[in-house]
Amino acid sequence: MNGVINIYKNTGMTSFDVVAIVRRVAKMKKVGHTGTLDPAASGVLPVCLGKATKIIDYIMENKKVYRVNLKLGMVTDTYDLEGEVLREEDASHITKDEILNCINSFLGTIDQVPPMYSALKQNGVRLYELARQGIEVHREARKITIYSIENIKIESNDNIQMDVCCSKGTYIRSLCYDIGEKLNVGATMTALERIQNGTFTKEEAINIEDLTEELLEKHIISIEKALDSFEKITVNEKFGKLLRNGVKVFDNRMYSEEVEFNKLYRVYEDNGVFLGLGKRDEKGFKLEKLLIEE
């Protein structure tokens, strides 16, 4: 069985718990998820089976959409409700306009400092392991992109909800923390749900607790379909043969579409055969990942 199953992970489970269940249902070992969701978070977690594990890194590059709830006036060491409360402040004087202006100031490409309670490593040690020992170290800010923040609901300063569309590597907990710091009252994330990962949506996801062999076979998505978020280009069979053999082709006659530099495309031969993912640079076009079904 080769393909991707769009799973909905419930709170209280690790992402590896989900993989273990899929392995058991599918009766196969070659299974992997496409980006960790914390146990306290729920939501969309595409899981790759068989040859589809080759495309895990590409699915992880997808834009993500998260539905997040945050509370103003409280800061914890983990930036969420799992941690120890470090300080509490009165946030009742903060107006809705101030909150909206602050939230919208984070749109675009920004520098974000990852939280201490994260799986990132420093000198070979995971940050959360240092944090549990009471050690805080300097973390370099990383470039991330917030594409949009929509459906903002301010029920009270204790409950703000919003949908955040962001790039790979974004820590929503850190976004909540940074919003609180900019408002000078602190903030903590109180709930997190991933509602979309590229073309994989919450509405089409199978709850992991409902997964059966029958549902898996019915809803598994082909490798080709799972890469729908990448634009498609078509080459003729002559050039397709060269690409299959790992040749970098420098010939603009190869494709009829406008092909940008350093951008991944789904590559098809003009007979409809899907070859894989390819990229153009100054020296030509080459398949980065051959995915043809032999």
UniProtKB/Swiss-Prot annotation:
Gene3D superfamilies: Pseudouridine synthase. Keywords: Isomerase, tRNA processing. InterPro entries: PsdUridine_synth_cat_dom_sf, PsdUridine_synth_N, tRNA_psdUridine_synth_TruB, TruB_C. The keyword Mitochondrion does not apply. Transmembrane segments: none annotated. The active site is at D38 (nucleophile). GO terms for molecular function: RNA binding; tRNA pseudouridine(55) synthase activity. It catalyses: uridine(55) in tRNA = pseudouridine(55) in tRNA. The keyword Zinc-finger does not apply. Its EC number is 5.4.99.25. GO terms for biological process: mRNA pseudouridine synthesis; tRNA pseudouridine synthesis. HAMAP family: TruB_bact. Responsible for synthesis of pseudouridine from uracil-55 in the psi GC loop of transfer RNAs. PANTHER family: PSEUDOURIDYLATE SYNTHASE TRUB1, TRNA-PSEUDOURIDINE SYNTHASE. Belongs to the pseudouridine synthase TruB family. Type 1 subfamily. This is tRNA pseudouridine synthase B. It comes from Clostridium perfringens (strain ATCC 13124 / DSM 756 / JCM 1290 / NCIMB 6125 / NCTC 8237 / Type A). The lineage of its organism: Bacteria, Bacillati, Bacillota, Clostridia, Eubacteriales.
